């Protein structure tokens, strides 16, 4: 835990008592603050009270006695409208912040020179965060990883000299961190997402930009420039006098980090210098993972990891569950769990990464269906359709891709395995990349992915991928 001493002797309200909210309560109390815990969910209020915290309805508190409102990222700060607790705090002149802001303030008090790596982007931020932490640990660094990736930041060990905090940040978390100042900041990409919470793509992009804009002098701001919004962010941050390390996996750069033929290069005034290779690394397959790997490589090199350690770390990276996770191999057939692909754009990244595909798709359909994936249809040997989207996807595939309506994973997995084995293709892939939400049959994509893994490992003669 990171005790938060910057509010010692003051009263702090915490609204939203999920994992990060309860961790904030504990950290503030440990640092000497008086905590008032609140939530719209009565069960969470009961849980907080049982944990020893004072609970209250913030409608009735004396805001003049409150030093700050710590808000969980899931509660609207601006769009579609500020939550009532936010409006009440703002009306009283009380600052509204999040748990990562508490971390930033404590770091400046305890160990201002301790490395702090912050990562954001519409896609790839979890993989990049996990990869950076893996590379640092493999190189012998004392490394703490948390934030949006799943572990509340205030549950980690405190900032200390020589200890690196690697933190994934969503746009919601950035919005709640006004003094964000990572020593290494990474913006991977910006595409349309979460517009219900930001109002427009322009506002969403501006929030993402703040992460790299906050990098202090002497730090490293890394920005992927393969989309227009991120490229604009790089220009704006550079105009403010910051040093920006641009990154591209799609085009040459005169200065920055580029990826070509599975090699990562540092380019200075047009001169290229190879820093790592990612060919043959199954967990980093695909152009999107090339961007993740290049950003991670640039980050750890900036922190002092040498190139030999970087290459060893890349080759030993196991990847993240449900993100092009290599579950097993049955003879020549590779089974890949990409359950995190809950829309067509995400599924495209997996479909672009393999050639002989036996595709398991479907679930609760998203707007737009799979029409945008037509360019990948020639790579799909057969599709196995599940869930509510099965009939809709069948209509799209009809006459273009052989398909079977399976309804469930329990039917789709053995049928796909049978057909892949009988195909006599070189390196066939049974790919779960649903292009759909999971909620028609599973509570979340993790449970869907876990079920796929169970079904695959229950098949005869399946071996782990090494």
Swiss-Prot record:
Function: Cell wall formation. Catalyzes the addition of glutamate to the nucleotide precursor UDP-N-acetylmuramoyl-L-alanine (UMA).
Catalytic activity line of the entry: UDP-N-acetyl-alpha-D-muramoyl-L-alanine + D-glutamate + ATP = UDP-N-acetyl-alpha-D-muramoyl-L-alanyl-D-glutamate + ADP + phosphate + H(+)
GO CC, any one term: cytoplasm
Underlying gene: murD
GO terms classed as biological process: cell division; cell wall organization; peptidoglycan biosynthetic process; regulation of cell shape
Name the UniProt record assigns to this protein: UDP-N-acetylmuramoylalanine--D-glutamate ligase
Pathway(s) per entry: Cell wall biogenesis; peptidoglycan biosynthesis
Organism: Rhodopseudomonas palustris (strain BisB18)
InterPro entries: Folylpolyglutamate_synth_CS (IPR018109), Mur-like_cat_sf (IPR036565), Mur_ligase_C (IPR004101), Mur_ligase_C_dom_sf (IPR036615), Mur_ligase_cen (IPR013221), MurD (IPR005762)
MF-aspect GO terms: ATP binding; tetrahydrofolylpolyglutamate synthase activity; UDP-N-acetylmuramoylalanine-D-glutamate ligase activity
Family: Belongs to the MurCDEF family.
Gene3D superfamilies: Mur ligase, C-terminal domain (3.90.190.20), Mur-like, catalytic domain (3.40.1190.10), NAD(P)-binding Rossmann-like Domain (3.40.50.720)
């Amino acid at each position: 835990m990171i005790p938060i001493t910057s509010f010692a002797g003051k009263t702090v309200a915490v609204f939203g008592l999920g994992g990060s909210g309860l961790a904030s309560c504990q950290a503030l109390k440990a640092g000497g603050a008086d905590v008032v815990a609140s939530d719209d969910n009565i069960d969470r209020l009961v849980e907080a009270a049982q944990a020893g915290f004072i609970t209250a309805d913030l409608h009735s508190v004396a805001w003049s006695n409150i030093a700050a409102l710590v808000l969980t990222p899931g509660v609207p700060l601006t769009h579609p409208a500020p939550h009532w607790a936010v409006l009440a705090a703002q009306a009283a002149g009380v600052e509204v912040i999040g748990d990562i802001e508490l971390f930033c303030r404590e770091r400046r008090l305890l160990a201002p020179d301790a490395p702090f790596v912050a990562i954001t982007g519409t896609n790839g931020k979890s993989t990049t965060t996990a990869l950076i932490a893996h590379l640092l640990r493999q190189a012998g660094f004392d490394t703490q990883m948390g934030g949006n990736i799943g572990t509340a930041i205030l549950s980690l060990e405190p900032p200390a000299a020589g200890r690196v905090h690697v933190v994934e940040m969503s746009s919601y978390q950035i919005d709640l961190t006004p003094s964000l100042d990572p020593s290494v900041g990474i913006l991977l990409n910006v595409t349309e997402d979460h517009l219900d919470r930001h109002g427009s793509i322009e506002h969403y992009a501006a929030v993402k930009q703040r992460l790299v804009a906050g990098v202090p002098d002497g730090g490293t701001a890394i920005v992927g420039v393969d989309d227009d919004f991120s490229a604009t962010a790089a220009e704006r941050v550079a105009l403010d006098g910051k040093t920006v390390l641009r990154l591209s996996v799609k085009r040459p750069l005169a200065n920055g980090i580029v990826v070509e033929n599975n090699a990562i290069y540092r380019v200075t005034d047009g001169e290229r210098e190879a820093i790592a290779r990612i060919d043959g690394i199954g967990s980093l397959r695909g152009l999107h993972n090339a961007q993740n790997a290049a950003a991670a490589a640039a980050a750890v090199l900036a922190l002092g990891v040498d190139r030999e350690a970087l290459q060893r770390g890349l080759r030993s990276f196991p990847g993240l569950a449900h993100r092009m996770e290599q579950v097993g191999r049955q003879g020549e057939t590779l089974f890949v769990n990409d359950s995190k692909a809950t829309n067509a754009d995400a599924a495209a990244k997996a479909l672009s990464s393999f050639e002989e595909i036996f595709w398991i798709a479907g679930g609760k359909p998203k707007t737009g269906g799979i029409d945008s994936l037509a360019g990948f249809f020639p790579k799909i040997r057969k599709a196995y359709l599940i869930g509510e989207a099965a009939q809709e996807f069948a209509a799209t595939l009809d006459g273009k891709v052989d398909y079977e309506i399976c309804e469930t994973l329990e039917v789709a997995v053995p049928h796909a395995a049978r057909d892949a084995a009988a195909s006599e293709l070189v390196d066939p892939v049974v790919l779960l990349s649903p292009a759909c939400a999971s909620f028609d049959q599973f509570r979340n994509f993790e449970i869907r992915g876990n079920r796929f893994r169970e079904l695959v490992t229950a098949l005869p003669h399946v071996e782990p991928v090494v």
